[in-house]
Amino acid sequence: MYKDKVLTEIVQNTELGSIIFDNTIFEEVSQELFSPSSWLHSKKSSNEIGGRGNVYFLNDGDKKYVLKHYFRGGLVSKFSYDSYLWLGENKTRSFREWRLLKFLYDKNLPVPRPAAANYQKNNYLYKADIITQQIPEVQPLATFIAEKTIPNNFWCKLGYQIANFHFVGLFHADLNAFNIQIDKSHKSWLIDFDKGSIRE
């Protein structure tokens, strides 16, 4: 998971908003970074990893990333499917999730390393994206338990891992069998921290 360098936080203004990024991953950033077509390889994900069809796998020939565009759910999506009310930079969905991931990553918890996030503002609304490093060779818990023989200690280890997140005060707004990912060594990872928070 590319833990060779300390995660940094840089904020750079753009024409319509800002980008927050780790400059040990991306030395230079622009809005083009969040366009799948600007990458050497990009592939839209299947729905099995969760989300609303808003995730792309990106590959620059060296490292692999995941790009998520923020979409609304529920009834409100009928009126505004990817725009959110502007309440300030620090309250954007993308910046909040990026910083929450950084907090968890810095505590050596099993989460994807945040690479970059952005927002683009238009009057009282904004749109947003986030890029994280891809966790190698994982599958959703839902798929794992349907296809694999479950090791005897698997559920205990999973419970212990989730407890570690609670010990640091994490509230995950959508913890389900798709946002828990299992790698080849049966280690569990948590993803999708949109609307998550740290609570005392």
Task: Describe the residue ranges of each PLM region.
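Conserved alphaE helix
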Residues: 150-161
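Short gly/pro-enriched beta-turn/loop segments at secondary-structure junctions
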Residues: 125-127, 159, 173-175
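Catalytic activation segment of kinase domains across protein kinase-like and atypical kinase folds
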Residues: 178-200
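Conserved ATP-binding subdomain of kinase catalytic cores across diverse folds
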Residues: 31-138, 163, 167
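AlphaC helix of the protein kinase catalytic domain
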Residues: 140-148
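Generic detector of well-ordered alpha-helical packing
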Residues: 69, 134, 175, 193-195
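Catalytic-loop of the protein kinase fold
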Residues: 167-177
